[in-house]
């Protein structure tokens, strides 16, 4: 057991250095995209989002959604699924658990 601990203690600095070297460029890429994609909407973008929602509601009322191409329908479905999943992730974080609330 002592030999294992000694070997681990000898190899740990090189393993940590390798992990840092490996993760630095990937972390920089992650932060770049996180700053771009996870930023909340600006006040100037809110009217555009409202118009988009109104357009979706209008297309549901008139039935114009039936004229979407398959590609547009798939993309709309993926966006809706992403929003739905982020809602559930927020619920899990808020509940501090996957099932049930602590009441």
UniProtKB/Swiss-Prot annotation:
Could you tell me where this protein is found in the cell? Mitochondrion; Mitochondrion inner membrane
Positions carrying N-acetylalanine: 2
What domain of life does the UniProt record list for this protein's source?
Answer: Eukaryota
Alphabetical list of InterPro entries matching this protein: ATP_synth_F0_gsu_mt (IPR006808), ATP_synth_su_G_mt_met (IPR016702)
Keyword Transport annotated? yes
Q: Which cysteines link up through disulfide bonds? A: none
As stated in the Swiss-Prot or TrEMBL entry, residues carrying the post-translational modification N6-acetyllysine are 11, 24, 35, 54
Which molecular function GO terms apply here? P-type proton-exporting transporter activity
Task: Output a single Gene Ontology CC term carried by this record.
Answer: mitochondrion
Q: What keywords appear on the UniProt entry?
A: Acetylation, ATP synthesis, CF(0), Hydrogen ion transport, Ion transport, Membrane, Mitochondrion, Mitochondrion inner membrane, Transport
Any Gene Ontology biological process = proton motive force-driven ATP synthesis
* Keyword Ion transport on entry: yes
- Report the family membership: Belongs to the ATPase g subunit family.
Q: What does this protein do?
A: Subunit g, of the mitochondrial membrane ATP synthase complex (F(1)F(0) ATP synthase or Complex V) that produces ATP from ADP in the presence of a proton gradient across the membrane which is generated by electron transport complexes of the respiratory chain. ATP synthase complex consist of a soluble F(1) head domain - the catalytic core - and a membrane F(1) domain - the membrane proton channel. These two domains are linked by a central stalk rotating inside the F(1) region and a stationary peripheral stalk.
Return the protein name.
ATP synthase F(0) complex subunit g, mitochondrial
Which organism does this record belong to? Mus musculus (Mouse)
Gene encoding this polypeptide?
Answer: Atp5mg
């Amino acid at each position: 057991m002592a030999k294992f601990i000694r070997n681990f203690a000898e190899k740990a600095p090189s393993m940590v250095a390798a992990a840092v070297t490996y993760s630095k460029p990937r972390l920089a890429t992650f932060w770049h995209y996180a700053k771009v994609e996870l930023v909340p909407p600006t006040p100037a973008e809110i009217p555009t989002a409202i118009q988009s929602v109104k357009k979706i509601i209008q297309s549901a009322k008139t039935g114009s959604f039936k004229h979407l191409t398959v590609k547009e329908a798939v993309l709309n479905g993926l966006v809706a699924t992403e929003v739905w999943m982020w809602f559930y992730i927020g619920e899990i974080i808020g509940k501090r658990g996957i099932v049930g609330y602590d009441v």
